[in-house]
Amino acid sequence: MQSFLPLLMGIMASASSVEWRHPVIWFNSKVVQSSEVVVKPGTSLELKCGGDGPVNWQTRLPKHKRYMSRSPGNLRTIRVARPTAEFTGTYKCFYSAWAQHRHLTSSVHVYVKDPNRVFWTSSTSLRVVRKEGEDYLLPCLLTDPEATDLGLRMDNGTTVPPEMNYTVYRHRGILIRSLQPSFNADYVCTAKVKGVEKTSKTFSINVIQKLRFPPYVFLEMDEYVRIVGEELQIRCMTHNPNFNYNVTWNYTTKSRVTIEERVRSSGENRLDIQSILTISAVDLADTGNISCIGTNEAGVNSSNTYLLVVEKPYIRLWPQLIPKLASQGLSVEVNEGEDLELGVMVEAYPQITDHRWHTPTSPSTSMQEHIYHARLQLKRMNAQEQGQYTFYAKSNLANGSISFHVKMYQKPIAVVRWENITTLTCTSFGYPAPQIIWYQCSGIRPTCNGNNTGLPKQNHPQALTVEVQREEYGAVEVESVFTVGLSNHRMTVECVAFNLVGVSSDTFTVEVSDKLFTSTLIGAAGVLAIFLLLLVFLLYKYKQKPRFEIRWKIIEAREGNNYTFIDPTQLPYNEKWEFPRDKLKLGKVLGAGAFGKVVEATAFGLGEDKDNTLRVAVKMLKANAHSDEREALMSELKILSHLGHHQNIVNLLGACTYGGPVLVITEYCSLGDLLNFLRQKAETFVNLVMNIPEIMENSNDYKNICNQKWYIRSDSGISSTSSSTYLEMRPSQQSHIEASGRKSLCEDNGDWPLDIDDLLRFSLQVAQGLDFLASRNCIHRDVAARNVLLTDKRVAKICDFGLARDIMNDSNYVVKGNARLPVKWMAPESIFDCVYTVQSDVWSYGILLWEIFSLGKSPYPSMAVDSRFYKMVKRGYQMSQPDFALPEIYMIMKMCWNLEPTERPTFSMISQMINRLLGGQDEQEKLIYRNVQPEQVAEGEACDEPKRYDPPCERSCDHEEEEEPLMKTNNYQFC
């Protein structure tokens, strides 16, 4: 047979010298007559191909080519001793040397039967990733020709999506046409062998959605200004749903440009590229447009900016006035009582470091990098406000000023006085300078200027108007003298003064009236009326002065829907809280309000150990406080003593009520209020959460320095740093203080980085504190991050600053009626119905959660408290999820913001939910910032429970039995 084949091929070659034929395929030495052959398990596979010229095989898998060999003549052989199901497929033979005969091919489909595998699938093809709209062939190759009903279904047993269109090919697999994102799922190929369904391995199909929009491209500034020789750095922020996009720059600059890209993946469906263009030293020729361009398969998007290069620093000032005043330039004339807005547009580089108006009115300024708009609002102007208004601006390298000259139109005022028996003088004030005209008429008349009297009138233009006095800013005084002629009749003389603004007149009766002292009496009555009005106004302003009101309320009893609140002034005061004044050393002021302040102090002998020293906070009144404020401070003292001790409220330690002003001694919280703490830690927190690589390179920009300066807000209560590592709220020997004082301040927990667990702990601790207040029948009414303090071990404690906050100057407190209220933190029933309950505290707690997980942002950002705000709250508007809130935390927020108070969770429920997020451990076990010093750990003292100072009220057994809490479903306080 082997010798016969070359002879046969030679005959075929000579016979086909005129016309070539399709190649011939032999399967196991037999000419293939059909399109399919079957290889039984355990047998070999041999395929030969021959033709009129050199031939070659095309196999399904490239690796099968290693089984090929060339035989004598124009023969090509594939020989596999023990083929597996992998060799199932279509084998195609073609002419390899003659391009004009490539179309002459022969093929055969080989089934390699495998009783254990009806389908052969490649492991590399099981995970399918394709773009939307593409076709894809699932390589489900049947190894058994007897298999029937080849099909496709989902791996979970359900049918394919109804919109999926596919075609079955027994020799190739299943072709899915026009892939869609809705096809994303796991699929299997199915077939029946002797009535039994067989399935292939699972194919996981992931269709990448076709991009429909170009990349997002953003440049921070519309214009950049630089001085010759300065460095320019422009950041272009871009993002795209996938990796298939690029960022380029278009610029006309002449200087050398370097471009750096920072790539970051934000989840599966977003790639961020920050492209940074840098010119180390700009030149005047670099002035021009610069564009950042992002390109993907959907198109192109760009953002443009302009570079202006100047030779030297500059400050340019232009006036900005409303259109009707713009033509007046810098000299502005307005009517009395009108509003005036003076505006200045400032262009400066480098940016201004200081700006001010030379006027007592507060300015408002909005600014970009080098363009500013400063405006001065003058409401209902009066004569005293006219004058020169100068705006000053300066930078490190330049300064400038611009002045407006504001003059006010004033209606003239005419006054006639009798100089002698024949002479009258009329004096008038106004701006512009008034003109004076005299009239006289017979009889006693209210006016001579008009025909309504029916009497003859005489005009005397010969009485000239003379300017007496002119001020630079103010009314012009003019005067006119009129000589009265002799007459036997009573006569009325009228002086009329007029200018562009208005007219004023005054009359004089030449013959003396019989009613003596009438003018005097009228004048006295007028003065008395003005005095009474002034007195009423001063009394009203006195009543409007801010009064301190303690926010916390204690419920005494409940009868049906009627609730009785305890008058805090009627609460008893336990004398055991008294502490000697001479053992209290006052320090710096930590916070101040309108009538009170909080100072840091050192207490000697406070507690059971009479030799210890303790840092405390002392609340006291200012010298200008009224009796109402003194009574309110005593009420606060009584409420704190009534509540008792809890780890998550600022506890009362003592008081001084005799021999001087009232002093309330409380725990000292060295890390200040939670709001400022979150804002101070925000930058490092974001860097840690986002895992930005640059944080290690630029760590000096973010880490806390031991001697860093902390700023004290007027409304923040207690916020300070300390040069001592004093144990927080624990008695300590002076020697221990000195030893620990030598420790690095960086060991303080205030310098530790902030993480998500810290935010969860703060949330849990505040909820536990509020749960304690609720159990003591106490409504807080001002739950907010500014009213939560942190100890140096990061334990959150609830407080109420009250006297120590200046709510008149705190933007968080909005005027509503006759009070200033924290509207953005208040529940709807508190805003609209003046109803305060534990449930309204729950609403406020939801706002506090939002503050915590937004790292100290103001709630309802960029939303003014106006009618639109009230409508949105009433309709159930809820803030979106904060940047760093877990979904479970945001769910708690939304539960707290339920419009129906009874549907809101209790603080106990909230504590349980947050505790589960922390791992279900007891809060005391969760606290990693334990209240111990490093020295104690070394000495083996860390395992001892620190002694707690028990307040006198706890030792006095005032509360022999815990009463059933009165707070049930709805406890209302009606205003």
UniProtKB/Swiss-Prot annotation:
Question: What SMART domains does the annotation carry?
Answer: IG (SM00409), IGc2 (SM00408), TyrKc (SM00219)
Q: What region holds the Protein kinase domain?
A: 584-918
Q: Which residues lie on this side of the membrane: Cytoplasmic?
A: 541-975
Q: Which residues form the Ig-like C2-type domain?
A: 34-113, 125-208, 221-310, 329-407, 404-513
Reactions the enzyme catalyzes: L-tyrosyl-[protein] + ATP = O-phospho-L-tyrosyl-[protein] + ADP + H(+)
Primary location recorded for the protein, binned into one broad class: membrane
Q: Where, in residue ranges, is this chain on the Extracellular side?
A: 18-519
Per UniProt, where does ATP bind? 590-598, 619
Q: Which UniProt keywords apply?
A: ATP-binding, Cell membrane, Disulfide bond, Glycoprotein, Immunity, Immunoglobulin domain, Inflammatory response, Innate immunity, Kinase, Membrane, Nucleotide-binding, Phosphoprotein, Receptor, Repeat, Signal, Transferase, Transmembrane, Transmembrane helix, Tyrosine-protein kinase, Ubl conjugation
Q: Which GO terms describe its molecular function?
A: ATP binding; cytokine binding; growth factor binding; macrophage colony-stimulating factor receptor activity
Pfam families documented for this protein: Ig_PDGFR_d4, PK_Tyr_Ser-Thr
Q: What protein name applies here?
A: Macrophage colony-stimulating factor 1 receptor 1
Could you read off the lineage of the organism from its UniProt record? Eukaryota, Metazoa, Chordata, Craniata, Vertebrata
The UniProt gene name for this protein comes to csf1r1
